Amino acid sequence: MSRSLGIPVKLLHESSGHIVSVEMKSGELYRGSMIECEDNWNCQLENITYTAKDGKVSQLEHVFIRGSLVRFLVIPDMLKNAPMFKDVRGKGKSASLGVGRGRGAAMRAKGTGRGTGGGRGAVPPVRR
């Protein structure tokens, strides 16, 4: 089953090879070079400066971080110019009808719906 990736996950993949900071839900902080990152935010870092909750700092060579334990990531500012953001800005309001979640917008735009028409406030048909 193929899914399209959201902007945050794409940005995470773009950060491979750059220095990132990863704060864990437990309060620990890892700062190092991102080797690889997965869609579920599992990350591999190398040459890490690890800061424990109590402030003690140590150096680590290589770590694997479980994505579900990550609170947030800090990535380099240079990635704000990544090509994925240019696509988002260029779209504007010229989207075609019916694009989005569900059918509501397409049905309203066409003026049709389910059933024989009518609904609240409409005059019911006269039966003979």
UniProtKB/Swiss-Prot annotation:
Keyword hit for Nucleus: yes
Single Gene Ontology BP annotation: mRNA splicing, via spliceosome
Location within or outside the cell: Cytoplasm, Cytosol; Nucleus
UniProt main location, coarse: cytoplasm
Sm domain span: 7-79
PROSITE patterns: SM
InterPro entries: LSm4/Sm_D1/D3, LSM_dom_sf, Sm, Sm_dom_euk/arc, SmD3
A cellular-component GO term for this protein: nuclear body
Observed phenotype of the null mutant: No visible phenotype under normal growth conditions, but the double mutants smd3-a and smd3-b display embryonic lethality.
Gene Ontology molecular function: RNA binding
Region of interest called Disordered, as start-end residue ranges on this chain: 90-128
Biased composition (Gly residues): 112-121
Tissue expression notes: Expressed in young seedlings, roots, leaves, flowers and immature siliques.
Keyword Nucleus carried by entry: yes
Function: Core component of the spliceosomal U1, U2, U4 and U5 small nuclear ribonucleoproteins (snRNPs), the building blocks of the spliceosome. May play a minor role in the splicing of cellular pre-mRNAs.
PANTHER family for the chain: SMALL NUCLEAR RIBONUCLEOPROTEIN SM
Family, similarity comment: Belongs to the snRNP core protein family.
Protein name, entry field: Small nuclear ribonucleoprotein SmD3a
